[in-house]
Amino acid sequence: MLSPEAERVLRYLVEVEELAEEVLADKRQIVDLDTKRNQNREGLRALQKDLSLSEDVMVCFGNMFIKMPHPETKEMIEKDQDHLDKEIEKLRKQLKVKVDRLFEAQGKPELKGFNLNPLNQDELKALKIILKG
């Protein structure tokens, strides 16, 4: 039987370890999705170079190749890119929250600038006008 102090330390370590595992799993998933996104980008680039729109193209699905019409293939890859972009963005938002919880559990201060968002087009134009004037 563990002493109350040892049990408290053990619970703390288990909590920190679980939070760290969640952070690492999300990071790994982001890397995997980004790899797939880059492969799609390569495929789209190859389709753009191929000017014969009337011909069917070979597409690899897992371990199987399928012949598909050029326009449908391009549309399918673009939809997949949009889905991957949204999924990666969602994971990044979740990752920020999980990292904050991990730092809180470890007693570390919150990361400065970690929750910043980029300027949109209108904000950027306004900033340029202010800096020029």
From Swiss-Prot:
Keywords attached to this entry: Chaperone, Cytoplasm
Compartment annotation: Cytoplasm
Pfam family for this entry, one: Prefoldin_2
InterPro entries per record: PDRG1, PFD_beta-like
Gene Ontology CC terms: cytoplasm; prefoldin complex
Record flagged with keyword Methyltransferase: no
GO biological processes: protein folding
Main location: cytoplasm
UniProt GO MF annotations: unfolded protein binding
Role of this protein: May play a role in chaperone-mediated protein folding.
Family: Belongs to the prefoldin subunit beta family.
Subunit field text: Component of the PAQosome complex which is responsible for the biogenesis of several protein complexes and which consists of R2TP complex members RUVBL1, RUVBL2, RPAP3 and PIH1D1, URI complex members PFDN2, PFDN6, PDRG1, UXT and URI1 as well as ASDURF, POLR2E and DNAAF10/WDR92.
Official protein name in the record: p53 and DNA damage-regulated protein 1
Gene of this entry: PDRG1
